[in-house]
Curated annotation (Swiss-Prot):
SUPFAM superfamilies: CoA-dependent acyltransferases. It comes from the Eukaryota. This is Tryptamine benzoyltransferase 1. One of its GO terms (molecular function) is hydroxycinnamoyltransferase activity.
Length: 445
């Protein structure tokens, strides 16, 4: 791997974008999101478009979404009320060019994205909020690896931005620049007076700075003990899961139910323990009034289906899906408004809110966290020569974190990427394709 160039891509628009120079406060949803850079890696077989065309399309897309070209900063309202903001200063998107002599097929076979996206910055302040690496392979293939800061966008927004970028490359001069909804303030309008009715202190936030007893070196050592594995559930396997559930059931629900059961079995947890899954829920349509579908930013809260290990392992797929569905349904308009009101009250009191999201090196066992990319518009990441041959999984630095990714091509299916302790990973790989709903319970009771 050789990095051949590194440059900041900046945009120029006439007249300037209305947000140019603004310091946009983070919304309540932004503040609850991970304070991390999230990698995303697309692989394209030859023939692939030129790097110049990909960069020009990126420039056009960034002009429509100027927040990604800014930087995280702190407002100047005094020490007690200092808040992070997105400074729309057009400092630029970092773009790296790289070459590697091996063929792309070797990378696709290994399904490893190491070194195929920019290194994750140690600090958010001053770092480019969107960074891109274009890696050319000896066979003519191309990998587009990017990292974006989660305070700028959630998965839905990242998917929309990437689809816009691809369309700009594909359509070139015929591309019509969109006008997405960039007003983050509409996501968090509190009642007057604000009246939170749920306890959000232990769910989305905790009061005070998030502390960690681990140094960076200790966190890195913990990450080394985590095994990143990937398993593919074919379209036929997913159909069999849905048949086990019976009735209406989404791909996400049935695959999550299956993974939750099998990972819990692989962990060998005590039957009286409880296990829960942190499930990201897109709140755009659930809010009252609903937010625009093209709202760019964060608008995600979390559901927490929770079951006792004994019950989870002995329950049918139908019952586990029911528990997941019931937990997600509780993230409704009333809950969303309560969350917004809670943040308003905490700010009025001068409380420092720290997100409860896990940090690299942390272990979630006996719990899990799932991010679903199944509804993302990856098929629209066609740069003009066809959709990606694969969406590669980045390293997952948190034990118990899993990602569901749609399989490209005609076959369909779902790729599950998960980080587990080494021995749990080995056990999971041995049972992950078993459809015996109660097969593992006898070893735990």
């Amino acid at each position: 791997m050789e990095i051949t160039s590194s440059a900041m891509l900046k945009t120029t628009t006439t007249p300037p974008h209305p947000l140019a120079g603004e310091k946009v406060p983070l919304s309540a949803f932004d503040r609850a999101a991970f304070d991390v850079f999230v990698p995303l890696v697309f692989a394209y077989r030859a023939p692939a478009p030129s790097s110049e065309a990909v960069k020009e399309g990126l420039r056009v897309a960034v002009a429509a979404y100027p927040l990604v070209s800014g930087r995280i900063a702190v407002d100047g309202q005094g020490r007690r009320r200092r808040r992070r903001v997105l400074h729309v200063n057009n400092e630029g998107v970092l773009v790296l060019d790289a070459t590697v002599e091996v063929d792309l097929d070797a990378v696709l076979a290994a399904n490893v994205a190491t070194d195929l996206y920019p290194a994750l910055p140690e600090h958010s302040f001053g770092a480019a909020l969107l960074q891109v690496q274009l890696t050319r392979f000896g066979c003519g293939g191309l990998v587009v690896g990017l990292i974006g800061h989660h305070h700028v966008f959630d998965g839905h927004s990242m998917s929309t931005f990437c689809a816009t970028w691809a369309r700009a490359v594909r359509d070139s001069e015929a591309f019509i620049v969109p006008s997405p909804s960039l007003d983050r303030a509409i996501t968090g309008v509190p009642r007057s007076p604000p009246a939170p009715v749920f306890d959000h202190r232990s769910i989305e936030f905790k009061v005070g700075n998030k502390s960690s007893d681990s140094s960076g070196a200790a966190a890195a050592a913990a990450v080394e003990k985590i095994a990143n594995i990937g398993v593919r559930f074919t379209a036929k396997f997913v159909a069999e899961l849905k048949a086990r559930v019976g009735g209406r059931c989404s791909t996400f629900e049935c695959v999550l139910a299956h993974a939750w059961k099998k990972i819990t079995a692989a962990r060998g947890l005590k039957p009286e323990e409880f296990t829960r899954v942190r499930v990201a829920v897109n709140c755009r349509r659930r809010a009252n009034p609903p937010a625009p579908a093209d709202l760019f930013g964060n608008m995600v809260l979390w559901a927490f289906p929770r079951l006792q290990v004994r019950r989870l392992l002995s329950s049918s797929y139908r019952d586990v899906v029911g528990a997941i569905r019931a937990a997600v349904a509780r993230v409704d308009a009333e809950y969303i408004q309560s969350f917004v009101d809670y943040v308003e009250v905490a700010d009025a009191r001068g409380e420092e809110l720290a997100a409860t999201a896990a940090e690299p090196g942390e272990t979630l066992c006996p719990d899990l966290e799932v991010d679903s990319w199944l509804g993302f518009r990856f098929h629209e990441m066609d740069l003009g020569t066809g959709p990606p041959a694969a969406v590669l999984s980045p390293d997952l630095p948190i034990e118990g974190l899993m990602i569901l990714v749609p399989v490209g091509g005609d076959g369909g299916g779902v790729d599950l990427f998960v980080a587990l302790a080494d021995d749990h990973a080995q056990a999971f790989e041995q049972i992950c394709y078993s459809l015996e709903e109660h097969a593992m319970i006898h070893s735990h009771l």
